[in-house]
């Protein structure tokens, strides 16, 4: 697949589309992540595993060895066909092993972490970017090429029909009638290769309750004594989160102290695919059928609906996008899943903590002082919750007033080598600094400004 780069689409458009279209009565419905990838199931020889981008080797460890391409985990999220159960929506498979997808084992830190990484990215795309993006796009700048000015943030396939994609994105629910002959346009699959996690000292927040976390993996063992401000973690390898904590009690009764742990994660090599889905309604619930492909039974109907709405022939039923890197703030509190016995029977030799949430690193606000969307532009945003209509309306107002600041912020946070200094995090919750100072303070690498990188 060949790609061409479209410059300067802000982070708010790095994905598409949650069902919450303002024109529909179901605008507050929380969609499950629309990720289904069926091609991976199992290939004993490993020959097709190299094509699985979600678990392929990272850019720094690319190898032609098929065995290496079978390491790690791949996650798919089930598509809803009725009532969505958020506690039973993901399935996991370990590459190189036989068998079907299985639920992630929360007692295995590497599975739990991978699931949360994947789920956090997908939640970010669906719940905290897409709906504001649509509103912003349609109201302020209704053109792909006109949005932003600062960086190459997204890459489309060369055969993209820009007008067609714009219509699909801006009218993500194509309503043919009041029955079951409607089509939804949204995220079909999402894959990524690896993630960078910064050193402990750089991601400790100013709060006294923040605790240092040591992340160990096979990829790091050989360089534990080497200072590296952006250690690269290969998600094919096991990642263990071990937390050094204050404890109370004795023996097996020792418990980790409470506290918030945060790590900045820069996700790399992202590919997203968007497609149409046949939809219908069951009372107030949305039911999803199969994704439309070039030769699926519903393709003809989709093309008829499209032509009736716009008077043009629908050329494509799916679009693949390559996204530049973006960053998540991994947030979790200590949860002991396993206690390893020490040589002297000390039960507190090691405790394993798994993350329990994702947040995205935003500046406190766009204009130094609290604004209408202050609840949205908080330092730590809960991505497990969908933005409300009020939040999105307020956000739009701020975006209209501060478009250039938004563009600068978006360009900066998507750099490949994001480095947040400890001093920058300690000084503020970004409240007293200007946007310019904010960028100068945190987007530096070894004392050099990285803001202009592309």
Curated annotation (Swiss-Prot):
Keyword Membrane in record: yes
Compositionally biased region (Low complexity): 55-64
Residues making up the signal peptide according to the UniProt record: 1-21
Residues with lipidation of kind S-diacylglycerol cysteine: 22
Lipidation (N-palmitoyl cysteine): 22
Start and end residues of each stretch annotated as Disordered: 55-87
The protein, known as: Uncharacterized lipoprotein MG095 homolog
Subcellular location: Cell membrane
Main location class: membrane
Ranges of biased composition (kind: Polar residues): 65-87
Source organism per UniProt: Mycoplasma pneumoniae (strain ATCC 29342 / M129 / Subtype 1) (Mycoplasmoides pneumoniae)
Record membrane topology: Lipid-anchor
Keywords: Cell membrane, Lipoprotein, Membrane, Palmitate, Signal
Recorded GO CC terms: plasma membrane
């Amino acid at each position: 697949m060949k790609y061409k780069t479209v410059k300067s689409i802000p982070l708010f458009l790095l994905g598409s589309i949650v069902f919450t279209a303002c024109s529909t009565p179901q605008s507050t419905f929380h969609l499950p992540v629309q990720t289904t990838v069926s091609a991976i199931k199992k290939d004993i020889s490993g020959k097709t595993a190299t094509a699985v981008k979600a678990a392929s080797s990272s850019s720094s460890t690319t190898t032609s060895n098929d065995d290496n391409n079978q390491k790690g985990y791949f996650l798919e999220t089930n598509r809803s066909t009725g009532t969505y159960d958020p506690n039973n929506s993901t399935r996991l498979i370990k590459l190189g092993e036989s068998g079907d997808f299985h639920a992630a084992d929360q007692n295995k830190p590497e599975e739990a972490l991978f699931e949360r990484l994947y789920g956090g990215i997908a939640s970010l795309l669906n719940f905290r970017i897409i709906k504001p993006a649509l509103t912003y796009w349609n109201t302020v700048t209704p053109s792909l090429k006109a949005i932003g000015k600062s960086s190459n943030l997204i890459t489309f396939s060369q055969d993209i029909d820009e007008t067609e994609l714009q219509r699909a994105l801006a009218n993500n629910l194509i309503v043919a009638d009041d029955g079951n002959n409607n089509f939804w346009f949204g995220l079909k699959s999402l894959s990524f290769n690896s993630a960078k996690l910064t050193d402990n000292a750089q991601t400790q927040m100013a709060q006294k309750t923040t605790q240092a976390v040591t992340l160990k993996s096979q990829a790091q063992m050989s360089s534990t004594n080497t200072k590296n401000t952006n250690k690269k973690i290969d998600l094919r390898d096991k990642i263990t989160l071990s937390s050094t904590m204050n404890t109370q009690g004795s023996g097996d009764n020792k418990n980790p102290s409470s506290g918030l742990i945060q790590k900045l994660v820069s996700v790399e090599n992202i590919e997203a695919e968007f497609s149409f889905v046949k939809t219908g309604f069951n009372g107030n619930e949305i039911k999803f059928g199969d994704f439309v492909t070039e030769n699926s039974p519903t393709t003809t109907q989709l093309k008829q609906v499209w032509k009736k709405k716009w008077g043009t022939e629908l050329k494509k039923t799916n679009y693949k996008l390559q996204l530049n890197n973006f960053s998540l703030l991994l947030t979790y509190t200590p949860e002991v899943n396993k206690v390893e016995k020490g040589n002297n029977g000390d039960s507190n030799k090691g405790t394993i903590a798994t993350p329990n949430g994702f947040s995205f690193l935003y500046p406190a606000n766009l204009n130094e002082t609290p604004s209408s969307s202050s609840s949205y532009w908080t330092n730590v945003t809960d991505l497990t919750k969908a933005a409300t209509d009020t939040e999105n309306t307020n956000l739009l107002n701020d975006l209209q007033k501060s478009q250039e600041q938004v563009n600068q912020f978006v360009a900066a946070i998507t750099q490949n080598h994001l480095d947040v200094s400890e001093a920058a995090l300690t000084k503020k919750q970004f409240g007293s600094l200007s946007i310019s100072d904010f960028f100068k303070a945190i987007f530096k690498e070894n004392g050099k400004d990285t803001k202009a990188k592309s």
